[in-house]
Amino acid sequence: MSPIRAALFLGATALPAATGAQTAPVTVKPIVYTQRTLANGLRVFAIRDTSTPNVSVQVWYDVGSKDDPKNRSGFAHMFEHLMFKATRNLVPEQVDRLTEDVGGYNNASTNDDYTNYFEVVPANHLQRLLFAEADRMASLVVEPVSFASERDVVKEELRQRVLASPYGKLYSIYYPQLSYGVHPYARPGIGSLNDLQAASIDDVRAFHATYYRPDNAILVVSGNFNPMQLDRWIDGYFAPIAKPNRPIPRVTVAEPARTQAVARTVYEPNTPLPAVLVSYHVPPDRDADTPALTVLQAILATGESSRLYQSLVYRDQVAQSAAAFLDTKQSTGNLVAYAIVAGGKTVQQGETALKREIARLRTEPVTAAELAEAKNEILTQAIRQRETAEGKAFVLATSTIVDGDPDASQKQLEAVGRVTAADVRRVAAKYLGDRQSATIRYLPVESRPAGSASDAVPIAATVRVADLRAPADIPVVTPAPVGRRVMPPQPAAPIAAVLPQPVETRLVNGLRVVTVERHDLPIVTASLVASGGAATDPAGRAGASGLTSALLTKGTATRSATEIARAIESLGGSIESGSSRDGASIDVTVKSDQIAPAMAILADVAVHPAFKPDEIERARAQSIDAVNVEFKDPAQLARLVAARAVFGSAPYGAPAEGTPESLKAITRDDVQRSYRATWTPASATLLMVGDITPTAARALAERHFGGWRAIGPAGAAPVVAAAAEPRVVLVDMPDAGQAGVVVARPAITRTDARFYPLAVANTTLGGGFSSRLNQEIRIKRGLSYGAASSLSARRQGGVIEARTQTKNPTAPDVVAIIVEEMRKLGTAPAPAAELDTRKAVLVGGFGRAIETTAGIADILGDYLVQSVPLSELSRYTGAVQGVDPRAVQAAAAELLDPARASIVVVGDARQFADALRRRYPKLEVIPASSLNLDSPTLK
């Protein structure tokens, strides 16, 4: 199953509860929907849910990257971008105005088999979205200026996601190209720079006329709506779209079975650690073997009790990370296993270990415990997907397009419940033989032996690709004259959201217990939160809080790390521990029938961590490998350097994850001190969100945490020094595929009275697709795939940063645009209409977050570590909406002034250093190889 399919796997069957369950197992009801087909062939699905104030509108077209024309790889994906431009009645980017500017959002994606367009908006805007989707299906306008600009944006997306990202070429280029010899799945969906440049406007018009038609699409509406009114709107907007009198081209070629193993070795720049990827052909998603393969994948790679994690990462430590996914499609797909090799290990060791675990599936039966755990994990994934209207729509649409049956996911889940150990071994033997493998070894270019070269991994000459045959007499659509343009309908009366209400109590030992009831789905998120975090790390020990948090789930006085993972995952649940700048948390999500045994595990890891020396060394090695990977990513490294530039020697300046040097310096005593200072009942809060009552939550808290006693005083809040003087820093990363750009400056605490005006100012600057930065950098100039800004308001003063990635030569231009947009916000008042849309972005994002148990827990957890009262949950929307233009300008003038900002660029200095120095004579150039993030000077 593909990554998206794995996330959307859904059904109605209750799977057997794990041993020790306290209540009857939960059941998952099937998605209730209506279906009809219009005369023009458009299939319409409606899923009504009156518990939400939102609605999701989705149009999925049965055309994807496999349908890219000859010499036009990446075409379906580029066309996806163009669908957000003009139509006969909509101006460019008006879909964003209709969604983001009212508190919703929109997006789209291109898969090998389909292209989907999806929006979530307040339900009173449903009619407007139906109007817009029908208009771009029927009357897309393609003109030279927007076509050229969006083509440049797609090129930047390719550079950002593939060329500049460590391992980007492994997953996006080499994997598909080696996996297929005949089927057009071989071509990367992102395309190539040459093919993108060769595309023409006539190609675009022909593609739209060929595939973007009602009989090649489905419409899914999910959320709060009146069914009769919905039908009238659909009949009014979509039914008049004509069905073309010509067949739809289909890819019918079949990929032959692989009977001889293939392997390639490649060397790439900016590769922090070697990697290996092995793929095996599997049948189409609709095949009867897919449920057994889904269980196999879960046993192999889901959670820390999985075989790959236990063998490669935990026990033998040959991999920094290891995973597998089931990439099923309409036609032949793949099961893919991969590993990022640990520091000091070889790619050969990683490959041997991966293939050893695959072989075990063929030769040894899986255990009953592994089988039950995998099924429970799949069920929990299904429940979590149903938390939102959008998630339910994705399930239905994916099943319809990929499998040809809207009930396919439900049927597959029922079949998962019937999978046996013999089934798992059978499909492993059938599909995962040694001779059926395709292996890619991906190594740093520095490790290439003298005189050798990378193996070629081209698209095979035998791959069959069709020419794009333009239909005759394609109409050229032009924008309607202003006076004749049909305007979107007005929104209806808004539907009020029901805000969750936290209920608080406190145990005798001081532990605060907060419950938020949500009984619509049988799921609970429990989060134990405490103040502390990376800001409390001692000098020279950056990463201590993060390492301590990671170790909480790696062993207690009575359970080993493996036993903890198996215990929680056997319940179908997950457990994660981590830290932020200001706090730490342990989070459990589980079906509500398993909350009692899950709470016992949560309490054990919080109260009785062992911090065994061997676990510390294992976690240390994994953390060092992880930061080494991060240091090879231009965008990530730019943010780390910016933190040092802004805060200097203050605690917020040090990397929260640590550096290789600081992580090596951390001792067991440091870990124990960090734990004692952070985790005390009086300074911690237990959040319980979901299908549980306050009475039941308190009883569980008393049972499992009532005996918890502090073993040391709570840590004091760190003293944060004044921000450092602004700097302009260029980190030279030779051969970087893109430049990462960050402009950052100090911000305020979360409790500061200026928080809401600054939040609106930040969102105006860089929050969302319609923000000023994205308008100037992406939409108008095509210099980046996207530009954004963020406000991190913390307990001791935070940071505001504007950031993007761009091709190396344009980095100085992008810096200039960011600086100018920051300046303008403080020198002239923003129009009230613009601010209204930016407020809607904040309010809409908040509303979507509180639709899920994890989202509510995250918001409340942030409030707790930032000393914000939980009543903020109820006042957030009003506080945002009450901000006026004068307050925004005042906040921007004081807190966005670029004169107090540091500028950081990470990229290939040869291509832009001189231009940047002309603008900033005090430019500091630091080679990436000698960058020292442990030092405030960076040297």
Predicted regions mapped to residue ranges:
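A common structural junction motif
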Residues: D135-P144, Y237-N245, R356-V366, D604-F611, ...
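Short, conserved secondary-structure transition motifs
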Residues: K155-R161, V253-Y267, N376-Q385, V590, ...
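Proteolytic maturation boundary segments
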Residues: A18-F45, N226-E268, A275, Q310, ...
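Bacterial N-terminal signal peptides
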Residues: R5-A17
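Conserved, carboxylate-rich catalytic/transport cores that coordinate ions
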Residues: H208, E576, Y675
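M16 family metallopeptidases and their MPP-like homologs
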Residues: F45-I47, T52-M78, P92-M137, P166-N194, ...
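Active-site His/Glu-centered metal-binding helix of metallohydrolases
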Residues: F75-M83, L296, L547-T548, A761
